[in-house]
Amino acid sequence: MATLIKTLAAANQSERVKLKIPRSVQETIPIRRIYTNGIWEVGRKHSRSWKLTDVNYIAASQETQKSIFKAYCGALNSLPTDATAKITIVNHRLNPAEFERRILLAYQDDWLDHYREEANRIMKGRAEQSNNLVQERFVTLSIPQRRIDESKAYFKRAEANLQKTFARLDSGIQPAMNYDRLRILHDFFRPGYERYFDYDDYRYMSRAKDFRNLICPDGICFKRNHFEFGNKFGRVLFLRTYASFVTDDLISDLTEYARDLILSIDMIPVPTDEAVKEVESIILGVETDITRWQQRQNSRNNFTAEVPRTMEQKRENSRGYMDDLTQNDQRMIFSLITLVHTADSLEQLDADTESLIAVGKEHLCDISSAKYQQEDGLNTALPYGLRRLHALHTLTTESCAVAIPFRAQELQDPGGLSYGINEVSKNPLICDRKRLVSPHAFYLGVSGSGKSMGMKSTIMNVVLGTDDDVIIVDAEREYGTLARAFGGEVVEISPHSTHHLNPLEIVFGFEDENPVAQKTELITSILEQQMANGAIKGSYKSIIDRCTANVYN
């Protein structure tokens, strides 16, 4: 056990800090110093965070889910063994005003406002299916405190490794700077004041302001089984025991609960050589116990006694663990799952706690409250990079990866247009196609699936929400009524209509090298389509050139 205790002791040593009774609410926040590059000094550690983009995991096919799970296992295997990792999922609900600002069309005091009112009513009806939840995901690495230039170089190498490994998951990695990290804490400690958050490194550092004044609550009080801050109540829960078999939707079920909450998964990777030595010592201990038991039975002349099932099971489990480490390319990982949720009243907090515990029971897992450790639990659950609770579980890579943090990718671009509802989260799909590398779009589906209706809805949103021009090539004559309703012009082109297209017309005023030559190429291509391939020879093309020039002259 010496090697493993040494590894775990090194991680615990960096968590130990001198006990200090806070004299202000600012001192309850364990951030000692922040640097402009996003590195924080917390306790006796340096931490750095990156923002993860979500992955469409829940609605994916089984083969795709297996591929994502395998890639996530590879990402966990690549975590550095000289650092601790924390994956954090932040749930926060949009207030109604912010929610409407994102999805509703702005009125412009013109004759189209009654259409905008109707469109907003439809979008509000769709939005009622949503719980207004927005999820953000972060990965935080923490290392024992060292010189800041050394920490900066370390996190730079770690960032390159994270970008490479999470790219295989189609999940992007973006550095979370001080603004992003402090915003998470501000929104948690000061709910209802999210829009007032305003932080700038230069402004605060040049004026020697304490950044904790910006994010701390008006007051905080830790009780036996909950804590109070501002006019809110909160409670920290942790996963006490795992089931023998855990499904990959445990984290998804916990985080889809329609409340403000933060869930964190702490991981301490163990070097493979130390893990193998530890498992070997466990196997040796089990074999020794079995040998001693058999010797006692032999001394009683009981030579046919079978080894007790408990001992045999310990032998099988330890050997299976060794096979995972040595043959299946897995790693030993100490893991801890914590969750902090808030409510407006203690009664509501208790009800929410019961619901979350019930979710754990559905997965045969025991979720408990961190009694008498609410402050330590809060500092563990929040993305500081600390781990003050010690309810660790020894897992393999695959067992740890079962707590996969991905659910469904959201699409909510500021200033975008509505394109429907997310199938998993039920949140509106808001997209600004102009920001994409290729803004083109297609509606694909079987007959009767709503392609035309979706296109008409998109056209309506473009007309009502932007100044863009809309040109429709309507071969099936479906969009005439829509165009007239929005003041558009319908041009009918057919052998019997009064409108005709003249492909040989030249519109003057455009800077073009030779418009006549372009018309010559057009006539030549038309004739080539009508005649056999290669029938137009060079002499014929010369005649076409001269005739076309004479027409325009």
Which residue stretches match the model-derived regions?
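Extended, folded cores of ATP/NTP-driven motor/assembly subunits in large transport
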Residues: 1-406
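Glycine-rich phosphate-binding loop of nucleotide-binding enzymes
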Residues: 40, 48, 55, 62-65, ...
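Structural beta-strand/beta-sheet cores of well-ordered domains, especially the beta-sheet scaffolds
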Residues: 46-48, 83-85, 135-137, 218-238, ...
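Glycine-rich nucleotide cofactor-binding entry segment
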Residues: 385-437
